[in-house]
């Protein structure tokens, strides 16, 4: 599915700043043909006292041909610096995984790790008063110890952005799958995952009523295609069922797609999701080998994957599966087992990834360090990957052949 990029994170922070009484302009550079000119026009027209830059992705997670995405962001920082003297603060999901190394690389004035809806307005207040900003939750300053992070416990206390703040008016609403997040955090602790570094390990939720009201506001503006960016839509299951029920109660004629963890799903949930407008799920089952699922610290097994996949097929929902091959303990036999398993599931689409991106402070990073794949001083900002020993020559070629013979696989 091709999505026009919309900046949910900056929009949430911008909404919080407006609620605190600040004037805000949000510039989405994904739609800017000439980035430097777009920044110059915005700076000259708005004359900002503070500039915030959101960094969502560090790289493309492609081991075969990795693309490091930070150089253009550093150019954005340099352009802003050249045009005005306003302090530059970086944040966002990608930044939050690498708060110190990314801040050094980008040469910004400071960074906010994690949620910015509370920290950024507080920072603006201190800047306006001319008092030190150190000590704000999640704040990183060059050469100083980072402040302790905090996580909002009541997400409903945080404002949700109106469409006019962040969705371009010169495009048709039908062109967008609008990102919506109803929950933050993840306690599943998969061996390679960076979600906890971004959102924290505890699951926190907006009330289903608040999310349904936001969806209704979007629908009234013509935006009926929704991308739930929750790390796992089906967890907790009772919450997912209640949210679907609220959507159904309001009669919202919407379409949505989401990520599903292949456990803790029953037929009732799959049917409710279909009735609420779910058209597609991303099912990250990662492997068809129970041995490898244990290695990746997954909480499900292959039998549960089969059951969940069938439930969504029975509900008439398009299923896009995801395989992640080459992690610790992977062998030719386990990789072949995964490919045969994926074929048997008969997904409508399948994404196969070779090699696992190594993120800081994860079990995978510890394994890679112990095996000498990374060094103790490697900050991992530039993409590094784990591929099980003795699979380097064989696995990429095997997957290329597998994809070539199956039109639904990418």
Residue ranges, per PLM feature:
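A short acidic, helix-capping loop that chelates divalent metal ions and anchors anionic groups
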Residues: 59-63, 290-295, 363
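Non-cysteine beta-strand/loop elements that form the S-adenosyl-L-methionine
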Residues: 52-55, 116, 270-288, 350-356
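Conserved strand-turn element in the central/C-terminal portion of the radical SAM core barrel
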Residues: 29-32, 261, 288-297, 309-334, ...
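Acidic, low-complexity intrinsically disordered segments
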Residues: 1-220
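Radical SAM [4Fe-4S] cluster-binding motif and immediate context
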Residues: 160-322, 340
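Catalytic cores of alpha/beta
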Residues: 99-105, 269, 329-343
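C-terminal accessory regions of radical SAM enzymes
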Residues: 140-143, 318, 333-410
């Amino acid at each position: 599915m091709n999505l026009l990029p919309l900046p949910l994170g900056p929009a949430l922070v911008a909404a919080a700043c407006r609620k605190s009484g600040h004037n805000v302009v949000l510039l989405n550079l994904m739609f800017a043909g000439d980035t430097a000119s777009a920044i110059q026009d915005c700076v000259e027209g708005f004359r900002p006292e503070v500039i915030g830059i959101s960094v969502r992705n560090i790289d493309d997670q492609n081991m075969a041909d990795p693309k490091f995405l930070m150089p253009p962001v550093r150019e954005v920082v340099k352009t802003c610096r050249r045009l005005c003297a306003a302090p530059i603060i970086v944040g966002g999901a990608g930044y939050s995984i690498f708060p110190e190394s990314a801040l050094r690389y980008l040469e910004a004035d400071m960074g906010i790790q994690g949620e910015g809806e509370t920290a950024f307005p507080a920072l603006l207040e201190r800047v306006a008063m001319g008092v030190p900003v150190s000590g704000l939750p999640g704040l990183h300053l060059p050469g100083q110890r980072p402040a302790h992070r905090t996580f909002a416990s009541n997400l409903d206390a945080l404002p949700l952005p109106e469409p006019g703040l962040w969705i371009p008016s010169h495009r048709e609403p039908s062109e967008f799958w609008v990102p919506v997040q109803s929950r933050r955090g993840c306690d599943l602790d998969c061996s390679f995952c960076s979600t906890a570094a971004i959102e924290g390990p505890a699951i926190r939720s907006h009330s289903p009523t608040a999310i349904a009201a936001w969806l209704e506001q979007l629908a009234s503006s013509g935006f009926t295609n929704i991308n739930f960016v929750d790390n796992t839509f089906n967890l907790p299951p009772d919450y997912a069922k209640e949210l679907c029920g609220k959507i159904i109660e309001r009669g919202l004629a919407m379409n949505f797609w989401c990520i599903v963890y292949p456990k803790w799903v029953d037929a009732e949930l799959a049917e409710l999701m279909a009735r609420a407008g779910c058209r597609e799920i991303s099912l990250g089952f990662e492997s068809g080998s129970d041995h490898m699922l244990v290695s990746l610290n997954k909480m499900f097994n292959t039998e549960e994957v089969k059951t969940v996949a069938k439930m969504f097929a029975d509900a008439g929902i398009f299923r896009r599966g995801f395989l992640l091959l080459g992690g610790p303990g992977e062998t030719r036999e386990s990789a072949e087992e995964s490919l045969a398993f994926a074929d048997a599931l008969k997904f409508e689409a399948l994404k196969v990834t070779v090699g696992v991106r190594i993120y800081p402070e994860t079990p995978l990073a510890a394994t890679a360090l112990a095996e000498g794949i990374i060094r103790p001083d490697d900050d991992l900002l530039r993409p590094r990957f784990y591929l099980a020993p003795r699979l380097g020559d064989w696995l990429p070629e095997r997957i290329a052949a597998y994809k070539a013979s199956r039109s639904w696989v990418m």
